[in-house]
């Protein structure tokens, strides 16, 4: 039976379009399920983000040159940073990519002029200290690492993943047994009610 992992991909938006796309592609090519609200929304509700991380098996962070959009109720922390912290709090296996300075220089942004540059550097340092982190210069490197890492994670028994119904043949049998037990239970309840009435 083949287990598909749900993989939450977190990154800033504008500076990492290609890297994020490459990560999604690598997850799909490895036969798993990419997730991440940034795949659909630039800004979204915390409840949706939490649910998406909770339902995921693995969390991937990609750090580029921007710290990211800050939270509405706490401007000292970006959504990306908050997602990273939350995934850690709920015990998700995490790994990260840091795009090298050389690769960032090829992008049409002056990252040091952007706001929160120092916060980004502090965030990078904490990520490097806490979880497996890979420096990457191109999208091919991201894809290779994701293939290797997900192969390792797929073998872990503590990660539930997703299974296709057709890969779980006993499910149909369980449905039938459950329906039979429900019918039997209803019949016994009816008999019990009848016995109560006759004994009164």
Predicted feature locations:
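Generic beta-sheet signal
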Residues: 62, 97-99, 136
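Extracytoplasmic/secreted cell-surface and envelope-processing proteins
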Residues: 18, 69-71, 105-107
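A short helix->loop->beta-strand "cap" motif at the edges of active sites that frequently abuts
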Residues: 89-102
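Hydrophobic anchor at the start of a short beta-strand
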Residues: 34, 94, 133
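Conserved TIR/SEFIR loop-to-helix hotspot centered on a Trp-containing motif
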Residues: 40-45, 66-90
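Solvent-exposed loop/turn segments at secondary-structure junctions
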Residues: 14, 42, 66-68, 101-104, ...
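C-terminal interaction surface of TIR/SEFIR-family domains
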Residues: 105-195
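Conserved N-terminal substructure of TIR/SEFIR domains
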Residues: 1-62, 90, 172-200
């Amino acid at each position: 039976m083949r287990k598909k992992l749900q993989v939450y991909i977190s990154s800033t938006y504008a500076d990492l379009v290609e890297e994020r796309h490459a990560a999604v592609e690598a997850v799909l090519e490895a036969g798993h399920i990419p997730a991440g609200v940034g795949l659909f929304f630039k800004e979204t509700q915390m409840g949706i983000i939490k649910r998406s991380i909770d339902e995921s098996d693995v969390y991937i962070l990609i750090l580029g040159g921007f710290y990211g959009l800050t939270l509405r109720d706490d401007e000292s922390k970006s959504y990306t940073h908050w997602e990273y912290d939350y995934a850690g709090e709920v015990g998700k296996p995490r790994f990260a990519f840091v795009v090298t300075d050389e690769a960032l220089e090829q992008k049409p942004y002056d990252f040091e002029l952007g706001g929160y540059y120092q916060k980004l550097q502090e965030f990078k340092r904490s990520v490097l200290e806490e979880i497996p982190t890979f420096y990457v210069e191109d999208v091919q490197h991201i894809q290779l690492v994701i293939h290797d890492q997900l192969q390792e994670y797929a073998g872990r028994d503590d990660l539930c993943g997703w299974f296709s119904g057709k890969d779980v043949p006993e499910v149909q049998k369980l449905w039938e047994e459950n329906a039979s037990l429900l019918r039997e239970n209803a019949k016994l309840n009816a008999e019990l009610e009848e016995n109560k009435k006759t004994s009164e």
